[in-house]
């Protein structure tokens, strides 16, 4: 995932003018949505930062608690695959995700700390929301650093998501119709999301200090001291 070759390969498949059928992207994995995830973004008064995402995967995880600590165990390996078995999400087995020694469960979590060339933290961000996490963390970063939106707008801006399987671009109901039209011009199949798309938490350095936003999609509010 972090190799320059892999990044270049993905970049070569992206076009500003059109999307493509699933087969064009040569998919090798499928990640089911999860439901037991939370994200926390923190900046201390000395400028040190923490971006932490925690998950038990599905609601109530493995549904098994430790008899000693009472901690609920996760069921993270359900995001992986077993040969000859289709998982509960209807996903066929993928060799890339077979359970093997030394491997980690497949995850979408991407807690992020953006640092400037001066070494100072510029943005702390992350999200909860299954396969939507990566997309919407990236969107919050793009909205703030590229488009210049303040952190509140970057977090609250209507979002979209496409996880390739199925090859449908889901958009939030209040997204600008011009965005949907532009997607369809590029041959995207769009549909309105039945609920919100992911939940983002972000902190951004400003000229006067720090600004924080907690996604109202799930009733969140930022806190400071």
From Swiss-Prot:
GO CC terms: extracellular exosome
Coiled-coil regions listed in the entry: none
SUPFAM superfamilies according to UniProt: N-terminal nucleophile aminohydrolases (Ntn hydrolases) (SSF56235)
GO biological process: glutathione catabolic process; leukotriene D4 biosynthetic process
Superkingdom of source: Eukaryota
Pfam families: G_glu_transpept
InterPro entries given in the database record: GGT_CS, GGT_lsub_C, GGT_peptidase, GGT_ssub, Ntn_hydrolases_N
Function of the protein: Likely to be catalytically inactive.
Miscellaneous remark of the record: Corresponds to the light chain of other gamma-glutamyltransferase family members.
Protein name: Glutathione hydrolase light chain 3
Organism this protein belongs to: Homo sapiens
């Amino acid at each position: 995932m972090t190799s320059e070759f892999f990044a270049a390969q993905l970049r070569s498949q992206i076009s500003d003018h059109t999307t493509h059928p699933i087969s064009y992207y040569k998919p090798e994995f499928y990640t089911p949505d999860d439901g037991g995830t939370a994200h926390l973004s923190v900046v201390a008064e000395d400028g040190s930062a923490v971006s932490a995402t925690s998950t038990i995967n599905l609601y109530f995880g493995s549904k098994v608690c430790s008899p000693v600590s009472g901690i609920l165990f996760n069921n993270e390996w359900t995001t992986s695959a077993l040969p000859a078995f289709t998982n509960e999400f209807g996903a066929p087995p993928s060799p890339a995700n077979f359970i093997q020694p030394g491997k980690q469960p497949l995850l979408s979590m991407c807690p992020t700390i953006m640092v400037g060339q001066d070494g100072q933290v510029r943005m702390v961000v992350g999200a909860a929301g299954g396969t939507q996490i990566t997309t919407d963390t990236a969107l919050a970063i793009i909205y703030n650093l590229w488009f210049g939106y303040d952190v509140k707008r970057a977090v609250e801006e209507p979002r979209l998501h496409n996880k390739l399987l199925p090859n449908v671009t889901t958009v939030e109901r209040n997204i600008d119709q011009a965005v949907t039209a532009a997607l369809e011009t590029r041959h995207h199949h769009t549909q309105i999301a039945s609920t919100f798309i992911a939940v983002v938490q972000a902190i951004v350095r400003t000229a006067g200090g720090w600004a924080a936003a907690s996604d109202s999609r799930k009733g969140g509010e930022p806190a400071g001291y």
